[in-house]
Amino acid sequence: MATNVINKYSYDRNSVKAGILHFGVGNFHRAHLEYMTSHLLEDPTQRSWGICGAMILPGDERLYKALKEQNGEYTLTVCGRDGKNEVYRLGALVELYWGIEQKEAILDKIADPDIRIITLTITEGGYNISRQTGEFMLDNAQVAHDLANPVNPLTAFGYVAEGLRRRKASGAGPITILSCDNLQHNGNTARRAFMSFVEAQDQELAAWMEENVTFPNSMVDRITPATRPEDVERLNKENGTDDKAPVYCEDFIQWVVEDNFAAGRPAWETVGAQMTDDVTAFENMKLSLLNASHTLLSYPSFLYGYRKVDAAMHDERIAKFVRQFMDIDITPYVPAPKDTDLELYKQTLCERFGNRTVSDQVARLCFDGASKFPVYVMPNLEKMIGDDKELIRVAYLFAAYRHYLKYHTDDNGEQFEVADPWLTVDDHKLIDSDEPLDFLALSPFRSTDLRAAHNFTQPYLRMVESIKSKGAMKTLEEIL
């Protein structure tokens, strides 16, 4: 029996015109940008900002057909931290094309003067930027295909380049390319990727883009789990629906957008977005508090035997540890962005981590630590070392990370596989070493010489020995 009431949009979708073309119609996009835009369309003055979805991958077929059958509509279940859900039927997706069958329609849509913003959720890897060089990889097979076959593209870069070529030829005017992916400086990354592609293919178009296309940075935040078949069944049962493509997410949402649009924009600030001149302060807050805290709780929680984040955060010891890290270690280095209550932000983070309905896997937070430490942990640790701060909590994190990588066994004797793909052969030699200080020379930590920082090495060595002899949780109890 249905237990949730569905909040349905009240506007006439026939009165809505697509002004946004979106690449990557996945769950996060449908819980974030489409959620905000569907609410925005309740305002009659904003009805020229509907969304046209562009799905270009062969693997998109199932979702494309499900959404097409439902005329672009679907239900979003917003899971409250208080255990109560809000359900919405969203209608912002007014057009939808699948590139495998409708390539020309997508290309023509990019050239349509009604389309004034192209938005992207193509994932971090989708920008095709080399981790080693930071440059766009022109030798990628699909990219090479698109460079040689401009009217038969496979990638978002190829689609956008050919669509903009048509836009330039028809005089349809400027356009904004807005990344909504969860990565730092996402607009700068999008600019590097798309401009590198176009410069390699069409110098005239590249010059036109320099004058007519902007790439605003934005910061996005909303936990949106993958929807498994059992989730679809559960959501439809709870909501009394027969939705082939439902989505569920947490009740927190944040979207900070650099106000740098080439051809106008929706009034997203009226539905909760924060428009700003610079997203850097917001990114720093998120990286230093949300992402760093995720990393902090991941390895100790996993070593203690927790496999779900919400279960770990309902352990008072871990919750206290995370909050001490936020308050004592990190807050001095995080200037609050304009109109932001930092205390409320931290409290909300702890509540979000403990939300049982959208629980994350601890293993996912542990995955690829080599990529996370340089971005989330090292910048503030370097400042803390320089300021001669107490470093016991961060030292404990490093000791727990070493134990996780070296011993593959938790406090309960349960063995596990480690997934840290960017560690090098030399890194693994340092992990295997019986000298704990060798671990501090790992490539993810190379931005500073941790072994020379005695205010760090002393507590670190203590933590290494304690975790090995007493276990991760007993050690944590002693430092709280």
Predicted regions and their residues:
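Substrate/ligand-engaging "lid" and interaction regions
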Residues: 1-480
